[in-house]
């Protein structure tokens, strides 16, 4: 294990439906991501795991990758989650998730995985449904159409760039029901694939939060943290972009580490991760759950799963220009970072 970990660190250190037309390059960083995010949120609301909307959105993303020239396919998996009725009776809901994968081949067998979950929240109880949490009309602009948009723009801008290490773009399913798609992805990986995976980057909830955060996994070695998280923060500073890392004010979440997303699955398996999100770790329980100060536009200080709040119309009104600006900022950080880590020619 130690030798494999050392190998990954050394390898990274060396590198320091509806179809939209795919253009050679976006005029400005973030434009393509913004367009894609709005399209996905508008035309594929209610992307709950196993629903027709999720299947259609998965096929749309696959077609976008193929238009860019990538080999891309959809992998389905069967899973289930518990639903709690009003009388507290619990029952299993069976689902078939759809995960989209596209491959950017490198010269070496090592790879970097860039992930964003495509599913939106499905009500897990009658109480959720009563509170307008999840369901057929949830756009999920923040959670997580914007993450998908950024991933697609990274793929678009890297499609003709030779890299030493391969890059796999993955739109996961089932994140909202317990990281089901990420679990299935890891389960399908061979021991060799796991060993050759230098880093998993997860893009999630990029818009509503006060500022960008770059967090490592609990098990990510310090040397890799410096090459990934700390390097991302340095790039952000060079562009005057407000970005930081978890300050560690909650003892359950150590300084510089993240929580509660698909990256956790890989972190627990001993694979280095970098979580990219927008929130405010200084508020509430200081666990990253409260994204911003409580206001009439965001009464609980977040937009989590709320049909009325997590849509581009509400966000545009409450936070004018935020979607475009945040897509641009994330791209200005992530594109050079990924090029460095993958050793782009």
UniProtKB/Swiss-Prot annotation:
* A cellular component annotation (GO) from this entry: outer membrane-bounded periplasmic space
Residues holding Zn(2+) 2: 143, 176
Enzyme Commission designation: 3.4.11.-
Signal peptide extent: 1-24
Give residues annotated as binding Zn(2+) 1.
117, 143, 204
Described function: This protein, presumably an aminopeptidase, mediates the conversion of E.coli alkaline phosphatase isozyme 1, to isozymes 2 and 3 by removing, one by one, the two N-terminal arginine residues.
Mind telling me which NCBIfam families this protein's record contains? Answer: PRK10199.1
State the protein's name.
Alkaline phosphatase isozyme conversion protein
Lineage of source species: Bacteria, Pseudomonadati, Pseudomonadota, Gammaproteobacteria, Enterobacterales
């Amino acid at each position: 294990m130690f030798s494999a970990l050392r190998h990954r660190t050394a390898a990274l250190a060396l590198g320091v439906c509806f179809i939209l037309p795919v253009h050679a390059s976006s005029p400005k960083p973030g434009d393509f991501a913004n367009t894609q995010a709005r399209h996905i949120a508008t035309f594929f609301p209610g992307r709950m795991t196993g629903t027709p909307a999720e299947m259609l959105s998965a096929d749309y993303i696959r077609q976008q990758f193929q238009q860019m020239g990538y080999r891309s396919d959809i992998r389905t998996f069967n899973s289930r989650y518990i639903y709690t009725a009003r009388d507290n009776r619990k029952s299993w809901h069976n689902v078939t998730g759809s995960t989209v994968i596209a491959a950017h081949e490198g010269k070496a067998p090592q790879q970097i995985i860039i992930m964003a979950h495509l599913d939106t929240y499905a009500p897990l109880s009658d109480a959720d449904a009563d509170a307008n949490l999840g369901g057929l009309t949830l756009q999920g602009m923040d959670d997580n159409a914007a993450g998908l948009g950024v991933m697609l723009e990274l793929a678009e801008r890297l499609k003709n760039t030779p890299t030493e290490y391969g890059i796999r773009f993955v739109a996961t399913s089932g994140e909202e029901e317990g990281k089901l798609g990420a679990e299935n992805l890891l389960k399908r990986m061979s021991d060799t694939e796991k060993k050759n995976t230098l880093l998993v980057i997860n893009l999630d909830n990029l818009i509503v939060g006060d500022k960008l955060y770059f967090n490592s996994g609990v098990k990510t070695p310090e040397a890799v943290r410096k090459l990934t998280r700390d390097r991302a923060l340095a790039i952000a500073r060079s562009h005057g972009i407000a970005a930081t890392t978890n300050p560690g004010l909650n003892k359950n979440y150590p300084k510089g580490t993240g929580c509660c997303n698909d990256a956790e699955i890989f972190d627990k398996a001993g694979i280095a991760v970098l979580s990219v999100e927008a929130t405010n770790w200084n508020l509430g329980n200081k666990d990253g759950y409260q994204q911003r100060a409580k206001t009439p536009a965001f009464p609980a200080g977040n937009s989590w799963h709320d049909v009325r709040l997590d849509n581009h119309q509400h966000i545009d009104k409450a936070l004018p220009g935020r979607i475009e600006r945040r897509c641009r900022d994330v791209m200005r950080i992530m594109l050079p970072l990924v090029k460095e880590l993958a050793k782009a020619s």
